[in-house]
Amino acid sequence: HTTCRRQRQMCIRDSNYTDKIAYIVDNGKRKKISVNRKATFKSVKVAAAFHGWLSLDKQKKIPQILKLMQFPCSDALSYSHLAEGRVDVVIQCSNKIWDIHPLIPIIKAAGGYISTWDNRDAINAGSILVSSNKIIHNKFLKLLKPVSK
């Protein structure tokens, strides 16, 4: 069973429904992709967007995140960049189920961590945090805590 998303042909292969592999198809050849597992908080690359969902008053509660934002978040493309190891954290507000569901298996197969800002399962959508490793994920959950309610 194979599912491909977008023109970039980012895919996930599900072998026996247990061994999941995320890959891209480049010139007809499959290339396995994975998150940047070596990312540290000091070297983190962050893509984020609040799309008018987070008021300026709330944004003032997360100054450290605002300082770390280096890339705009553009939905599936940003999540794809995380799965390929190009960025380490993606933060987005108010995702709908159809925004995030197709990406969850790709992110997980690439080794990423995904949850809502209040550390619930992302399957129900909402404000989403995706990270390349557990340490960074937990750090950003703490930073987002003032606005996660």
Language model regions located:
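Short polybasic amphipathic segments
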Residues: 9, 20-26
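An extended, acidic
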Residues: 34-149
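Single conserved hydrophobic/aromatic residue that forms the stacking wall/gate
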Residues: 1-12
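Conserved beta-strand and immediately adjacent loop positions that scaffold enzyme active sites
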Residues: 6, 21, 128
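Short linear motifs in intrinsically disordered
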Residues: 10-17, 120
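A short, compositionally biased
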Residues: 15-21, 108, 125
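Predominantly a core beta-strand signature of beta-propeller blades
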Residues: 29-30
